[in-house]
């Protein structure tokens, strides 16, 4: 690899909109994210499941099917 052409990789603090902070590596000075593992619904277990039954009923009602 050539010397002096690559950006400096350093430790940075990643800040989430929820207030959580953690350390990671990046070539940027600071990282801000909107969602992290502390507030993402997949990791918190507060997922919202859309039931397909409601959509099927709506389709059947719209087109007169049983």
UniProtKB/Swiss-Prot annotation:
SUPFAM superfamilies named among the record's database cross-references: L28p-like
GO CC annotation terms, alphabetical: ribonucleoprotein complex; ribosome
Cited Gene3D superfamilies: Ribosomal protein L31
One BP annotation, GO: translation
Keywords for the protein's UniProt record, in alphabetical order: Metal-binding, Ribonucleoprotein, Ribosomal protein, RNA-binding, rRNA-binding, Zinc
Keyword Oxidoreductase: no
Coiled coil region boundaries: none
PANTHER family listed in its UniProt record: 50S RIBOSOMAL PROTEIN L31, CHLOROPLASTIC (PTHR33280), LARGE RIBOSOMAL SUBUNIT PROTEIN BL31C (PTHR33280:SF1)
Family: Belongs to the bacterial ribosomal protein bL31 family. Type A subfamily.
HAMAP family: Ribosomal_bL31_1
Protein name as annotated: Large ribosomal subunit protein bL31
Source organism of this protein record: Geobacillus kaustophilus (strain HTA426)
Top-level taxonomy: Bacteria, Bacillati, Bacillota, Bacilli, Bacillales
Gene giving rise to this polypeptide: rpmE
